[in-house]
Amino acid sequence: MSTSIPDVAVHDSPAIAAPLRWVGMDGIVVPVQLTTADGGQHVIGRARAQIDLPAMGVKGIHMSRLYRLLDTYAVEPLTPVGICGLLSAMVNSHADCASTAARVDWYFDWLRRVPALVSNDLSGWRGYPVWLRAEYSAGHVQFWLCVEVAYSSTCPCSAALARQMLADAFLQEHVEVSALSPETVADWLRSNGSYATPHSQRSLARIEVALTEQAVELGLPALVDCAERILSTPVQAAVRRVDEQAFARLNGANLMYVEDATRRLQHGLAIHYSAFRVHVRHLESLHPNDAVASTADE
């Protein structure tokens, strides 16, 4: 009985000889260690690991090699500095395939404790979907960090229409009244202020920023803080009525079309980041479709 185990990827030739741009695995379950100024965090994520296959006569790559390298790296914090070593090891592990490029994508949710708007003793958890891509090619490494921020948007046109209807209703009801006390007006508004309300919706901003090879952390807190400060209406976690009231005030003070939100982010991010892309989606409550805008191609 033969004790040798066949290795088809090594000993067989492909039926069609052709180079492949990327080959690897997707959907790999991995632990992710994050280091931020807020402290460390361990989360579960998924990864995609790939290399190029320029050798036309090689039938297949050695995916187990990539898996073991990714598994070994998983015990380290996820940083650009550390990822550079992983990418280099991936390329070196496939010298027999003439590989010169490698890339890894990580997908996970970053959890953060956020305080209520007004209640000092109240806070709750928020989850931010994160995507990190690292690609090595031609001796250079590129990093893109993407985070999705959820916020509320209220339609400026709808707000104007609601104000007009409220004003018309007030005038119609008081057409024969020449003078009203402030208290009377306030009482009327408390009873009739919702005569017409503007439509609003949960909205999503996907923000991608370039990172440098020398970065010692991803900078997630700074990026999220910057985006939420620009938008002014991030969705909340735990709230009381006083916090919900403050949120309503923020929405009224920050009426936004999808174009407004995208331009706000474009202007504000340019102060802090040299290279970035913004994709915004408003999950319309008036229409069955979404409104979208972006600063770059998808």
UniProtKB/Swiss-Prot annotation:
It comes from the Bacteria. One of its GO terms (molecular function) is GTP cyclohydrolase I activity. Pathway: Cofactor biosynthesis; 7,8-dihydroneopterin triphosphate biosynthesis; 7,8-dihydroneopterin triphosphate from GTP: step 1/1. The keyword Hydrolase applies. Signal peptide: none annotated. InterPro entries: GTP_cyclohydrolase_FolE2 (IPR022838), GTP_cyclohydrolase_FolE2/MptA (IPR003801). Keywords: Hydrolase. The keyword Hydrolase applies. One of its GO terms (biological process) is tetrahydrofolate biosynthetic process. HAMAP family: GTP_cyclohydrol_B (MF_01527_B). Converts GTP to 7,8-dihydroneopterin triphosphate. Belongs to the GTP cyclohydrolase IV family. This is GTP cyclohydrolase FolE2.
